[in-house]
């Protein structure tokens, strides 16, 4: 057929010059569509003689295949070029560090509990635990707390309910960790040197009190244990905990489970609404302590004629507030992520005594 070479050259030239897939599709329809130029040429084969058709048919089919191949190749080239442009526009430096993911932090109470445990462990103390729901005996009777004591009042203590007709004393949410003393003495006897950190519960709620808080109990029993040992242990603890030398002051006080009993103050200064421990001329009450009452020893199965010892109890939340400048106890349990991110600790951050600082 006349003009096939020109037809071939024209379409290949136009296909090669297409700048986008839309233009390329227009060329495909114009060349190979139902009314396309090459398609119309194919229809003319029916008007030819067999001899002419034998020559023109293969030539037209070859042209059609070549144009189809050129369109496919051009389409692939345009796709590659578009991808290159996109990659340039969306280029990323894969050597840059990834954006850090938000991770949780260690709650100040958990951190301080670890610090307290580590310091006392360094002095030879082990950790003891007990149930948070206690019997009347372990929470009060065994600790020499009489039936008329104000601590037993429902306004101070959370009581559970017994079934109707059950006249046994109701269980309580323990008001202190002191019951662990009795349970440990019953099971392990004396001598002993333990601390008992854990949750305790009292019906109170204000800036410095919450219905649930954390306390650590300390108990040392031996044949020659004295108040002098108690003073040394507490001064060593506070100096290690606050990182400065801390002086203590003992004031005589009454607690049913110790005799004699003492409230312990630590040296501090009050400046601009902040408390600085270990300096100044002021004193801050920090815990209750004393020599374990003989009746408490007997309740735990210990002979008070053979063994004696001291005990103390302090609030973990309170010393956390002092050390880390936290103004309101209620914030510890408000589940405020902003507060937790500010006062929390990294998951791999060890207590200072573990790290050797």
Curated annotation (Swiss-Prot):
- The enzyme's main class, written as a single word, is ligase
Q: Which GO terms describe its molecular function?
A: ATP binding; magnesium ion binding; phenylalanine-tRNA ligase activity; tRNA binding
Is the keyword Nucleotide-binding in the record?
yes
What binding details are noted for the cofactor? Binds 2 magnesium ions per tetramer.
Q: Which residues, by range, are in coiled-coil regions?
A: none
Return the EC number.
6.1.1.20
Q: Give the cofactors, semicolon-separated.
A: Mg(2+)
Q: Which residues bind Mg(2+)?
A: 259
Cellular component, GO annotation: cytoplasm
The UniProt entry lists the main location of this chain as: cytoplasm
Q: Where in the cell is it found?
A: Cytoplasm
> What are the GO BP annotations of this UniProt entry?
phenylalanyl-tRNA aminoacylation
Pfam families in the cross-refs: Phe_tRNA-synt_N (PF02912), tRNA-synt_2d (PF01409)
Superkingdom in the source lineage: Bacteria
* Keyword check for Nucleotide-binding: yes
- Name the chemical reaction catalysed here: tRNA(Phe) + L-phenylalanine + ATP = L-phenylalanyl-tRNA(Phe) + AMP + diphosphate + H(+)
The record's section on InterPro entries has: aa-tRNA-synth_II (IPR006195), aa-tRNA-synth_II/BPL/LPL (IPR045864), Phe-tRNA-synth_IIc_asu (IPR004529), Phe-tRNA_ligase_II_N (IPR004188), Phe_tRNA_ligase_alpha1_bac (IPR022911), Phenylalanyl-tRNA_Synthase (IPR002319), tRNA-bd_arm (IPR010978)
Q: Which UniProt keywords are given for this protein, alphabetically ordered? A: Aminoacyl-tRNA synthetase, ATP-binding, Cytoplasm, Ligase, Magnesium, Metal-binding, Nucleotide-binding, Protein biosynthesis
Record's subunit section: Tetramer of two alpha and two beta subunits.
User: What family is this?
Assistant: Belongs to the class-II aminoacyl-tRNA synthetase family. Phe-tRNA synthetase alpha subunit type 1 subfamily.
NCBIfam families from the xrefs?
A: pheS (TIGR00468)
Q: What PANTHER family does this protein's entry cite?
A: PHENYLALANINE--TRNA LIGASE, MITOCHONDRIAL, PHENYLALANYL-TRNA SYNTHETASE
The entry's protein name is Phenylalanine--tRNA ligase alpha subunit
Q: Taxonomic lineage per UniProt?
A: Bacteria, Pseudomonadati, Pseudomonadota, Alphaproteobacteria, Rhodobacterales
Q: Which gene encodes it?
A: pheS
């Amino acid at each position: 057929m006349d003009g096939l070479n020109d037809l071939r050259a024209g379409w290949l030239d136009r296909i090669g010059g297409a700048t986008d897939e839309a233009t390329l599709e227009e060329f495909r329809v114009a060349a190979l569509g139902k009314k396309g130029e090459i398609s119309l040429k194919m229809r003319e084969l029916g008007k030819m003689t067999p001899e002419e058709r034998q020559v023109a048919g293969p030539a037209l089919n070859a042209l059609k295949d070549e144009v189809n191949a050129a369109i496919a190749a051009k389409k692939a080239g345009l796709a590659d070029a578009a991808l290159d442009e996109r990659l340039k526009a969306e280029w990323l430096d894969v050597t840059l560090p990834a954006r850090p993911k938000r991770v949780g932090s260690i709650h100040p109470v958990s951190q301080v509990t670890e610090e307290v445990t580590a310091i006392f462990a360094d002095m030879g103390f082990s950790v003891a635990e007990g149930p948070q729901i206690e019997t009347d005996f372990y929470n009060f009777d065994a600790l020499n707390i009489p039936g008329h004591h104000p601590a037993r009042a429902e306004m101070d203590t959370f009581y559970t309910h017994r079934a109707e007709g059950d006249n046994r004393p109701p269980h309580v949410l323990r008001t202190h960790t002191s019951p662990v003393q009795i349970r440990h003495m019953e099971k392990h006897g004396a001598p002993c040197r333990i601390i008992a950190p854990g949750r305790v519960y009292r019906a109170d709620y204000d800036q410095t009190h919450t219905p649930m808080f954390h306390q650590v109990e300390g108990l040392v029993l031996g044949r020659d244990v004295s108040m002098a040992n108690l003073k040394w242990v507490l001064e060593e603890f506070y100096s290690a905990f606050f990182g400065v030398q801390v002086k203590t002051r003992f004031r005589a006080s009454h607690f049913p489970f110790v005799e004699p009993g003492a409230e312990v103050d630590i040296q501090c200064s009050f400046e601009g609404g902040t408390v600085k421990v270990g300096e100044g001329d002021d004193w801050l009450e920090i815990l209750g302590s004393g020599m374990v009452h003989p009746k408490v020893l007997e309740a735990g199965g210990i002979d008070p004629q053979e063994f004696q010892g001291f005990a103390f109890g302090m609030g973990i939340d309170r010393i956390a507030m002092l050390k880390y400048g936290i103004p309101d106890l209620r914030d510890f349990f408000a589940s405020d992520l902003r507060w937790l991110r500010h006062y929390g600790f990294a998951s791999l951050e060890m207590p200072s005594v573990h790290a050797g600082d």
